[in-house]
């Protein structure tokens, strides 16, 4: 999926509002994913998955940092996320289907925290961005 110039502008503008909360939003998105898709918990058997756990917060920070990196490299998402794609495909062996459900949790989290900025156009751009990130993260499975 190709991000248009308008999509890139929308994504960057929305992400600038996230600011230093990327880790918190990442943790919240993980919690939403675990609640909505309980099978995703199987990849975290060693985690305390309760609300507000230190492990979920720490992993949420990794998610937020990865998305911040991606926002900074919208013209080269495969290059920017190559190592993360390798990690998930070859070491962690996460089922690629799980990457299809994670964008919804991220979109919900952003909509809750950025209600005034979450216009239909921004929603569509963020959806394309998160779906593209998911596609890139599963690209090494092929």
Curated annotation (Swiss-Prot):
One of its GO terms (molecular function) is haptoglobin binding. SUPFAM superfamilies: Globin-like (SSF46458). O2 binds at residue 59. Residues 2-142 form the Globin domain. Heme b binds at residue 88. GO terms for biological process: hydrogen peroxide catabolic process. Signal peptide: none annotated. Red blood cells. InterPro entries: Globin, Globin-like_sf, Globin/Proto, Hemoglobin_a-typ, Hemoglobin_oxygen_transport, Hemoglobin_pi. GO terms for cellular component: blood microparticle; haptoglobin-hemoglobin complex; hemoglobin complex. Transmembrane segments: none annotated. Disulfide bonds: none annotated. Keywords: Heme, Iron, Metal-binding, Oxygen transport, Transport. Involved in oxygen transport from the lung to the various peripheral tissues. Heterotetramer of two alpha chains and two beta chains. Belongs to the globin family. This is Hemoglobin subunit alpha-1.
């Amino acid at each position: 999926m190709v991000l248009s110039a308008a999509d890139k502008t929308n994504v960057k503008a929305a992400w600038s509002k996230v600011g230093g909360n990327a880790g918190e939003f990442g943790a919240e998105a993980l919690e939403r994913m675990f609640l909505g898709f309980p099978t995703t918990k199987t990849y975290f058997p060693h985690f305390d998955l309760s609300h507000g756990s230190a492990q979920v917060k720490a992993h949420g920070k990794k998610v937020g940092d990865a998305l911040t990196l991606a926002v900074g490299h919208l013209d080269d998402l495969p290059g920017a996320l190559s190592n993360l794609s390798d990690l998930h495909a070859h070491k962690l062996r996460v089922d690629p289907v799980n990457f299809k459900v994670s964008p919804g949790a991220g979109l919900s989290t952003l909509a809750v925290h950025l209600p005034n900025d979450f216009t239909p156009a921004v929603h569509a751009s963020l959806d394309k961005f998160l779906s593209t990130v998911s596609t890139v993260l599963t690209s090494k499975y092929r």
